[in-house]
C-alpha cells in the first residue's frame, strides 16, 4: 500500500452546524493515508476541512494542514507534490510574498491567492487540493490532469462533501 496524505471536507449549504461525529468518521476513514498528523478545522459552523498528513518535503509542524494563507482569507488541504514549487516560490517572493515554511503546500496556497484558478496553468506535479475562500464562502477543487492523486466529491441539496477516498464519503452518511 502506497502511503499518501488524505484530504476531505464538508460544506453545509443551509449553514447548519456540522455534526462533529461525521467529521470524525471521515477523518478516521482517512487516517491510514497520513500517519504523521491529522486534524479537523472547523472554519465556521458549516465548513470543515480535514487532513491526514504523510510528511515528505517539509517535516516541520508549521506545514501541518489545513493551512491558512497570509491574508487569512484562504485555507487549503493538499495531497501530492508540486515539482516546480521552488521556481513558483522564487517568483512569488520577487512579488513580496513572505513564506513561513519550506514546503510546497504554502507555495501552492499563496500562488492560488495571487493567480486564482489560473494557478493550474503553472503547476507541474501530481496533486489534489481544495481551497476554501472565507470571503466568497466558496470552494475551489482541483487535481492533476492525469488524476494521479484522487479527489472525489458528492453534492446534494444539503451539502458538498469531498475526499481522497470514496469510502470516507460513504462512511459519512451524507
Regions found by a protein language model. Name each.
Residues 2-174:
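Cysteine-centered catalytic environments shared across enzyme families
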Amino acid at each position: 500500500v502506497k502511503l499518501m496524505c488524505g484530504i476531505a471536507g464538508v460544506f453545509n449549504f443551509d449553514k447548519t452546524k456540522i455534526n462533529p461525529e461525521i467529521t470524525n468518521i471521515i477523518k478516521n476513514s482517512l487516517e491510514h493515508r497520513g500517519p504523521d498528523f491529522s486534524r479537523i478545522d472547523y472554519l465556521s459552523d458549516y465548513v470543515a476541512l480535514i487532513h491526514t498528513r504523510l510528511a515528505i518535503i517539509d517535516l516541520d509542524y508549521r506545514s501541518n494542514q489545513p493551512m491558512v494563507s497570509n491574508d487569512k482569507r484562504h485555507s487549503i488541504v493538499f495531497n501530492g507534490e508540486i515539482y516546480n514549487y521552488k521556481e513558483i516560490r522564487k517568483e512569488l517572493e520577487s512579488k513580496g510574498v513572505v513564506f513561513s515554511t519550506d514546503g510546497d503546500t504554502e507555495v501552492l496556497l499563496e500562488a492560488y491567492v495571487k493567480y486564482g484558478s489560473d494557478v493550474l496553468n503553472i503547476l507541474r506535479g501530481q496533486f489534489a487540493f481544495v481551497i476554501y475562500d472565507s470571503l466568497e464562502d466558496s470552494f475551489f477543487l482541483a487535481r492533476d490532469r492525469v488524476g494521479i492523486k484522487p479527489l472525489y466529491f458528492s453534492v446534494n441539496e444539503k451539502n458538498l462533501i469531498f475526499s481522497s477516498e470514496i469510502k470516507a464519503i460513504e462512511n459519512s452518511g451524507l
